[in-house]
Amino acid sequence: MSKAQDARSTATLLLPATYTVQEVFGFPSQLPLAGFAPGHPLVPKATPGYVWDAKIAKDFVEWLTEPNPDPLWIAGPTGCGKTDALKNVFAALNTPTVIVSAKSSTEPDDILGRVQLRNGNTIFVPGNLLLAYEKGYAIIFDEIDGYNPEVLMACHRLLERAVVTLDDGTVIKPASRIYMAATANTRGDGQGSDVYTATNIFNLASLNRFEKWEMTYPPAEVEEQILENTFSGKLQTTIMKAMVKTATDIRRAYLDGNCPGPISVRDLLRWGRKLIQAWNRKDVAPLYHSFDKAFGFGVDPHVRAMLHTLIQTNFGVPAPQIEGVTP
């Protein structure tokens, strides 16, 4: 059985179910949200210890309760949690999810499907994107501003929830309800391409089909709670607060042009894991060595030295000398 056929067969497992806003997002509300019964293999895994930013959660509630929600275009800096937020929504709703990844060399056929020779016959075999469209799975266009613009144009009818006619005459009708969302570092208009160099510019006809959101890094109290949920009993609260304060300072340095990139939530979690591992080491300064593994070794030594001064300020632990950098 082909992967496409297998994806079709799993649709029989889908049974509608209803969840409350409180069950999905954690704040008091019995407003119902449409989802499915547990058990489908394409439901994403929830992130352990995930904490919702209240503003983003309320935006999701508005989107999820629309009769026919438009596709989302969620723009924001790298590692701020765009894809993670979507995956946690669909995990809580037990909604099977297909994540579509592409790059500038990707062609429409690569994601929509291809004509193939089967048993001596030429047939069109739809890709998982069309299967998701037909069955009512959630669709995430990951890092969509890296797509070839022609790919997005080929998806116009899907973004409109229109009937799609395949090359062999097969008609694919959209499910009665589909959640489609795209994540991106830019708005698709070229702004920010100096930082995110592999991104593309899309025409207004494509961009007009999306509801636009902006995400940034979570507020300090949310990041602190994320660390607390992940490292409780392993790291002191004062250490986690200082880590978040350092991340905020690094992002400010980035905005001021003093750091080539911002530190992400992923980087913070990596720093915490590496700090726990290195805690008892005597051959390195654990606080700084774990930070460098998470983020610091990815920047110029002189920039790293500047970042170390931020850590020193927030933790009160003297920074080690970096070879080749004059104090």
Regions found by a protein language model. Give the residues of each.
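AAA+ P-loop NTPase catalytic core and its hallmark functional loops
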Residues: 2-238, 245
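C-terminal engagement/docking regions of AAA+ P-loop ATPases
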Residues: 47, 281-327
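Short alpha-helical interface patches
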Residues: 110, 208, 268-276, 312-314
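Short coil/turn residues that cap or connect secondary-structure elements
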Residues: 136, 143, 235, 279, ...
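Conserved AAA+ ATPase small/helical "lid" subdomain
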Residues: 219-293
